[in-house]
Amino acid sequence: MAVDPNVKTLVENRRARFEYEILETYEAGIQLTGTEVKSIRAGKANLQDAFALFRDGEAWLHNLHVAPHGTASKVFNHDPTRRRKLLLHRREIDRLRGLVEQKGLTVVPLRLVLNRGWIKAHLGVARGKKLHDKRQAIKERETRREIQRELKGR
């Protein structure tokens, strides 16, 4: 996959790939206020516990923590953990809702990116990993590191 020079990663959910097995990815816009945009551009957001839910034919992002902007007054600042609307096409919402309801999967944000001036969320359709799957992933990562160390040492 080629790297797009117009896309800059602002915040990444590094824990998601460890906690979940990512099956599919989607890109969605997010409905934000001005102070939220300023905070996210500054990297002051946390995707750790965030997830998407579907209600009334709309997709909503819950538990995305966006820190209040420092220079804005309390009156004009936003609620840090409010739910935010995800902007997806109808067929994408229907497909994601079907996957979540039928197969017991979940939708988690993987990262927030700045794409040509717009903040987008990369969403992953995910299945939770069991403890032994996580241990297996750690073992594989360690063996890859050791092999790379050996090759580098030669």
Swiss-Prot record:
SUPFAM superfamilies: Small protein B (SmpB). Keywords: Cytoplasm, RNA-binding. It is found in: Cytoplasm. One of its GO terms (molecular function) is RNA binding. This is SsrA-binding protein. It comes from Synechococcus sp. (strain JA-3-3Ab). Required for rescue of stalled ribosomes mediated by trans-translation. Binds to transfer-messenger RNA (tmRNA), required for stable association of tmRNA with ribosomes. tmRNA and SmpB together mimic tRNA shape, replacing the anticodon stem-loop with SmpB. tmRNA is encoded by the ssrA gene; the 2 termini fold to resemble tRNA(Ala) and it encodes a 'tag peptide', a short internal open reading frame. During trans-translation Ala-aminoacylated tmRNA acts like a tRNA, entering the A-site of stalled ribosomes, displacing the stalled mRNA. HAMAP family: SmpB (MF_00023). The keyword Cytoplasm applies. Belongs to the SmpB family. Its main location: cytoplasm. NCBIfam families: PRK05422.1, smpB. InterPro entries: SmpB, SsrA-bd_prot, SsrA-bd_prot_CS. GO terms for biological process: trans-translation. One of its GO terms (cellular component) is cytosol. PROSITE patterns: SSRP. The lineage of its organism: Bacteria, Bacillati, Cyanobacteriota, Cyanophyceae, Synechococcales.
